[in-house]
Amino acid sequence: MYLEHLSLTDFRSYAQVDLVLSPGVTVLVGYNGIGKTNLMEAIGYLATLSSHRVSSDGPLLRFGTERALVRARLVRNGQTTVLELEINAGRANRGRINRSNPVRARDLLGICQTVLFAPEDLALVKGDPSNRRRFLDELLASLVPHHAATRSDYDRVLKQRNALLKSARAGRVTAAHEATLDVWDQHMAKAGAELLHARLELVELLRPHLARAYAELTDASKPADAIYRSTLQNQMDDDGASLGATGRPGPGDAAAAEDLRGLSIEELTQRYVRAFGESRKKELERGISLVGPHRDDLELVLGQAPAKGYASHGETWSMCLSLRLASYYVMLDDARTGGSAPILILDDVFAELDVQRRRKLAAIVSGAEQVLVTAAVDADIPEELSGRRVKVVPGGIDEQGE
């Protein structure tokens, strides 16, 4: 798939901007702070309904405005689709598909698919588990759009259950509290099992591609791997740190999750119900849910050591890039069975890499149907990514500068 046209109204720094795009490589060049990333962020938001830079929608609206509009014309498998996303302050966002009546924003998920590489990706290795959970859930929503509803259902149940635990913690725990918790345990077990099952399947798809991508980028002897750490297996401590096979924070092996990978959603549901019962006393004492996919982690491993805390800066960057490439390869596999190859976005990434990693990454992505790259100067772009150049200037695009 590829974008033919992007239009933004009151998005970030832009009152109005239009960008004509084409298949192949397009490099947007402009000094730092000029607005290149805002353009890439808008495309990424259209694909995932979330920003790679901020956790809330407020900063996406141009200061002093009440809504922002992102419009795009997308060509997918030869068919043209016009997407429009209205981002509103204080109320639900809305979408339109081919100028239809308004639909829920999440109805747009899965239509425009992107893989976005950015400096913020360092948080995938160095950050807390929420960054890695978000990575998995966003990729799942792109591949299977109804996963967004699954995650939303789980978050809703989790919020209700936590409110009940806090209420019970504030006073004496009564039989009514216990009975109500039993009901919410069932709801959360079912929603959590669906979420966990989907994540486990996705991690198994990612693992071989992660190893391949890391080897392509580095020629390193250390193999790269990813291990899903679940609270169902006592793989996380009460503060959210990963536990290895020894029960101490640290790496383990993928076999530790073998029994979970072989379980059905119904079996996982029963596992959660039992786990909630075993942890109830501690949860009532703390007033929060200690078991569930909201506390799980995706541990990234280099050789025998976790990448977090042990990888060098260069290895950390290689792992981040490899994880994004792995998601790209998974999407390509999906495209071969009826999907469509995603748009690749590389936002100010090459400036962060040494020459060797620049050239290897460029060689890998150059064959994608559409590659959008941003850079402060042309010198940051490897020769392997020859293509159209677009000059970004204050407030818009310099058509004469292309």
UniProtKB/Swiss-Prot annotation:
GO terms for MF: ATP binding; ATP hydrolysis activity; single-stranded DNA binding
GO cellular component assignments: cytoplasm
Binding site residues for ATP: 30-37
InterPro entries: AAA+_ATPase, DNA-binding_RecF, DNA-binding_RecF_CS, P-loop_NTPase, RecF/RecN/SMC_N, RecF_2
Primary site of residence: cytoplasm
HAMAP family: RecF (MF_00365)
PANTHER family: DNA REPLICATION AND REPAIR PROTEIN RECF
Family that this chain belongs to: Belongs to the RecF family.
Protein's name according to its UniProt entry: DNA replication and repair protein RecF
Organism: Pseudarthrobacter chlorophenolicus (strain ATCC 700700 / DSM 12829 / CIP 107037 / JCM 12360 / KCTC 9906 / NCIMB 13794 / A6)
Lineage, top ranks: Bacteria, Bacillati, Actinomycetota, Actinomycetes, Micrococcales
